[in-house]
């Protein structure tokens, strides 16, 4: 399992699992998280052993949307770029592999973008969606 500051990446039984890993702030979309998510999506698409991609969240929420406390364009350690959120959505939409959003909790604002871009959405009955 590859672990970074804001995401987890693991391949299980032919599926690449990408977990948003900022439960302390409901997996809000910081520049670091967005860049790592993009990198994991690209890796999964390039890996012939991966047949599907699953995106989920760690903790009580799937994704709370934009991280309003994170400086725009903040880079992760060792990174020289920040990826625009729109590039993540385009990568999900254009993925040659099915992308499954496994919604474990509330999905708000930008988190709904991930839901809408995915091919399949699986959720619990008590999940909340909101703009």
What kind of feature is each model-predicted range?
Residues 21, 27, 57-59, 65, ...:
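Conserved phosphate-binding and hydrolysis motifs of nucleotide-dependent enzymes
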Residues 1-58, 73, 90:
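Conserved CoA-thioester-binding segment of acyl-CoA-metabolizing enzymes
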Residues 35, 57-94, 107:
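Glycine- (often His-adjacent) and acidic-residue-rich active-site loop
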Residues 91-131:
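Glycine-rich beta-to-alpha active-site loop
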Residues 26-27, 69, 109, 130:
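Nucleotide phosphate-binding site architecture
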Residues 18, 55, 67, 114-116:
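Hydrophobic/aromatic residues within transmembrane alpha-helices
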């Amino acid at each position: 399992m590859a672990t970074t500051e804001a995401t987890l990446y693991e391949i299980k039984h032919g599926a690449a699992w990408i977990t948003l890993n900022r439960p302390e702030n409901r997996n809000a979309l910081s520049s670091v998280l967005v860049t790592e998510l993009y990198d994991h999506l690209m890796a999964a698409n390039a890996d012939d052993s991966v047949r599907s991609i699953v995106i989920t969240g760690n903790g009580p929420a799937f994704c709370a949307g934009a991280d309003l406390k994170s400086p725009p364009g903040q880079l992760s350690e060792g990174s020289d770029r920040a990826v625009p959120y729109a590039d993540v959505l385009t990568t999900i939409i254009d993925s040659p592999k099915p992308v499954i959003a496994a919604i474990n909790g509330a999905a708000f604002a930008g988190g709904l973008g991930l839901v809408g871009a995915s091919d399949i959405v699986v959720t619990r009955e008590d999940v909340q969606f909101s703009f």
